[in-house]
């Protein structure tokens, strides 16, 4: 079957769908992957048919407006800035998406592109598969992660947050989507869901991390999507970099610190704070600069190593703790490794994951805007305590016992498309 996968956003958005695309290709499907233009190297290494598209979230987040975007905790402000970013690119992506999906027999997407993908699937009358990194469909247990990060007192209240988000989000995106739907020859307003083919909505998170959710067959919990051992080997990512492996083996397990795509206004000052905090706690530090600390050059000393990126699943089992921004992928990898986590969250689903780890007893959560050297020291000190370490180890055992999410997701897609 000809499948187009729309993978836009940051690494945490694109790489899970890259893993799924590779697995679907191995199942015999003819897969085309549309990926953000700055994140096409990995899918190319996997031999996928990849088409770069113009959305470059890294560049956007390095602008003044992008930096403001990740600091907004108010839903309306966050949505307004999101749509401003989409407005410039949305029309161009619409052209790209129409061309890319022409002739497709199914479309796969994540939340970043779901509005476009749903309209395309409606226009072409083909199945739609959506991938949720975080619980984002109405349920009784957890509220919408952009509305509230803690469960509300009643099931009805939790469910109501999804309607609230949908109404607020539609207010900001409707003009853009009206234009796109008109270009597809569709009425401006989508028809009621009962008149459309029901999509498959893969729930891409661990039931260990979000317990208590039950869905029907159209919303299977598959776990987080990551590269399979076969694809890790194909991409040359199945073993640690030899120099990093030697550094890890030369001392005590370090703290991994990364802020991913979160902009750090003064990388040198942040690095100095990390160095002092780790020294006071007797820890070595492995710092992955990502986008947020990209101004820092790689360096190595016995107590501190700075690298651009690491493969979380390879590195974290060698670490004592992890401090990160709260993306779904690194949250899952840290818990799977059985180590405690400090989440310094900024936007989107990051606060949800930070609070979820606190509720599970395996982590500490602070807002990135509140992060100081004292806050970092306090949080990392808590990660050295017995209760958090024991709970993290327990959750790690549970997660490692779960099946690998990517083959499970591909099997669910096959079943859905064959129905």
How would you label these PLM feature ranges?
Residues 49, 53-105:
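Phosphate/nucleotide-donor binding subsite
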Residues 88-159, 207-209:
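Conserved nucleotide-sugar donor-interacting segment of glycosyltransferase catalytic cores
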Residues 1-11, 15-34, 38-49, 159-171, ...:
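Nucleotide-activated sugar donor-binding and catalytic core shared by glycosyltransferases
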Residues 34-36, 53-56, 110, 131-132, ...:
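Generic beta-sheet signal
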Residues 40-41, 57-61, 130, 134-141, ...:
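Short gly/pro/ser/thr-enriched loop/turn and capping motifs at secondary-structure boundaries
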Residues 39-46, 118-123, 141, 209-218, ...:
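Short loop/helix-cap segments at secondary-structure boundaries that form the rim of catalytic
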Residues 72-85, 156-168, 395:
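Short glycine/proline- and acidic residue-enriched helix-loop micro-motifs
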Residues 205-321:
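Donor-nucleotide binding loops and adjacent catalytic segments primarily
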């Amino acid at each position: 079957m000809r499948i187009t996968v729309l993978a836009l956003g940051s690494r945490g958005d694109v790489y899970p769908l890259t893993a799924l695309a590779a697995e679907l290709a191995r199942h015999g499907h003819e897969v085309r992957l549309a990926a953000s233009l700055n994140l096409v190297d990995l899918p190319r290494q996997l031999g996928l048919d990849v088409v770069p598209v113009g959305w470059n979230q890294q560049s956007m987040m390095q602008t003044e407006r992008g930096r403001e975007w990740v600091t907004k905790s108010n839903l309306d402000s966050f949505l307004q800035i999101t749509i401003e970013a989409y407005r410039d690119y949305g029309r161009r992506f619409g052209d790209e998406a129409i061309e890319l999906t022409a002739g497709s027999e199914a479309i796969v997407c994540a939340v970043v592109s779901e509005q476009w993908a749903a309209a395309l699937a409606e226009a072409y009358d083909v199945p739609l598969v959506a991938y949720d990194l975080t619980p984002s469909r109405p349920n009784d247990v957890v509220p919408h992660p952009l509305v509230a990060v803690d469960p509300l007192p009643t099931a009805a209240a939790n469910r109501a947050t999804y309607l609230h988000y949908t109404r607020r989000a539609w207010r900001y995106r409707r003009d853009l989507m009206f234009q796109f739907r008109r270009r597809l020859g569709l009425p401006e307003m989508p028809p009621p869901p009962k008149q459309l083919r029901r999509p498959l909505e893969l729930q891409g998170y661990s039931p260990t991390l979000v317990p208590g959710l039950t869905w029907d067959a159209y919303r299977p919990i598959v776990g987080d999507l990551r590269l399979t051992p076969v694809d890790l080997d194909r991409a040359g990512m199945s073993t640690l970099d030899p120099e990093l492996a030697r550094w890890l083996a030369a001392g005590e397990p370090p703290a991994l610190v990364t802020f991913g795509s979160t902009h750090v206004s003064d990388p040198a000052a942040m690095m100095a704070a990390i160095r002092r905090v780790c020294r006071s706690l007797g820890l070595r530090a492995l710092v992955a600069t990502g986008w947020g600390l990209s101004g820092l050059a790689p360096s190595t000393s016995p107590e501190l190593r700075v690298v651009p990126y690491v493969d979380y699943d390879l590195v974290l089992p060698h670490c004592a703790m992890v401090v990160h921004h709260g993306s779904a992928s690194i949250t899952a990898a840290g818990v799977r490794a059985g180590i405690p986590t400090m989440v310094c969250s900024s936007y989107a689903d990051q606060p949800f994951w930070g609070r979820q780890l606190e509720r599970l007893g395996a982590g500490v959560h602070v807002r990135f805007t509140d992060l100081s050297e004292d806050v970092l020291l306090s949080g990392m000190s808590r990660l050295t305590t017995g209760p958090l370490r024991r709970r993290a180890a327990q959750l790690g055992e549970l997660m490692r016992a779960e099946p690998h999410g990517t083959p499970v997701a591909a099997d669910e897609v096959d079943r859905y498309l064959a129905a």
